[in-house]
A protein has these predicted regions:
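Glycine-rich segments within core transmembrane alpha-helices of 12-TM secondary carriers
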Residues: 1-17, 229-233
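Residue-level signature of mid-helix packing/kink "hotspots" within the transmembrane helices
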Residues: 7, 126-134
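C-terminal membrane-cytosol helix-exit motif in multi-pass small-molecule transporters
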Residues: 9, 13-19, 34-60
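Helix-to-loop junctions at the C-terminal end of transmembrane segments
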Residues: 17, 132-145, 170
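C-terminal transmembrane helical hairpin of 12-TM major facilitator-type secondary transporters
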Residues: 143-209
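Extracytoplasmic gate region of multi-pass secondary transporters
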Residues: 9-14, 70-126
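Juxtamembrane intracellular "pre-TM" segments in multi-pass secondary transporters
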Residues: 54-80, 182
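Intracellular juxtamembrane helix-capping segments at the cytosolic ends
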Residues: 1, 203-221, 225-226
Length: 233
């Protein structure tokens, strides 16, 4: 659901905002902001009305035994928390920077692409993450977390290097939704395409890092599961 929503929202927001120009103001984003407020309100109502039991937390309170060690005493857990912090910056940074570059005016060294098309390109990144998670889930039993994480990290590095060194004049056609919500092909720099392909790589990184960071922690697993999420917030 998360990946599907992330695929659709950039296209929808791009359509609601319209073409960015010198006259564009924050008021153009009001429809998208009102939509976000409605989603947050709905999520609050659903969570407030549901009773979600937490048996592990209740058992820990009932036990009342203070652990002599902290989860931070495990070196691989600390490294995993740092890795998740860096990963989240990369995961959200790639589509955000790509979107700013595509929608920026040509006077500001941007591409001047309309927001709907740019949002569709960015949505492809999140859609590839969805595909990657499905693929990673089916292959998870056949390959170790370390092996899978090493492979996608190397592949992502190759994609980023290609995006850096390929000239912006090298163009490629990508399937997108356009400003009139018609579906077709749009020319974007090949470097943008390689950044979008990084979605396949980032799709399984969080799970791989989490598995390696919490491996062999025994009774500390529950505590570290929550703490390892803090860098991603």
């Amino acid at each position: 659901i998360n990946s599907i929503g992330a695929t659709i929202v950039p296209v929808l927001v791009g359509y609601l905002i319209g073409t960015i120009s010198s006259e564009t103001s924050i008021a153009n984003a009001n429809p998208a902001l009102f939509l976000a407020m409605g989603i947050f309100a709905l999520a609050f109502i659903v969570l407030f009305s549901m009773n979600i039991p937490e048996p592990h937390a209740a058992a820990a309170v009932a036990n009342g035994v203070k652990n002599s060690h902290s989860p931070l005493s495990f070196r691989h857990f600390v490294l995993g928390a740092i890795a998740i912090f860096l990963y989240v910056g990369i995961e959200v940074g790639i589509p955000n920077i790509a979107n700013l570059f595509m929608t920026g005016s040509t006077e500001a060294n941007g591409l001047g692409i309309d927001t709907t098309t740019a949002g569709s390109v960015v949505g492809t990144y999140w859609f590839l993450m969805f595909i990657g998670r499905l693929t990673g889930g089916s292959l998870g039993a056949k390959f170790s977390s370390k092996g899978m994480l090493s492979f996608v990290s190397l592949l992502g590095l190759v994609f980023v290097l290609l995006a850096i060194f390929i000239p912006e004049t090298q163009m490629v056609n990508m399937p997108v939704f356009k400003a009139d919500i018609s579906f077709g092909l749009a020319q974007v720099p090949m470097s943008i395409m390689f950044l979008i392909l990084c979605g396949l790589c980032t799709s399984v990184m969080w799970g791989g890092i989490f598995n390696l960071a919490t491996e062999g922690l025994g009774k500390y697993t529950a505590a570290t599961s929550g703490q390892s999420r803090l860098p991603s917030q």
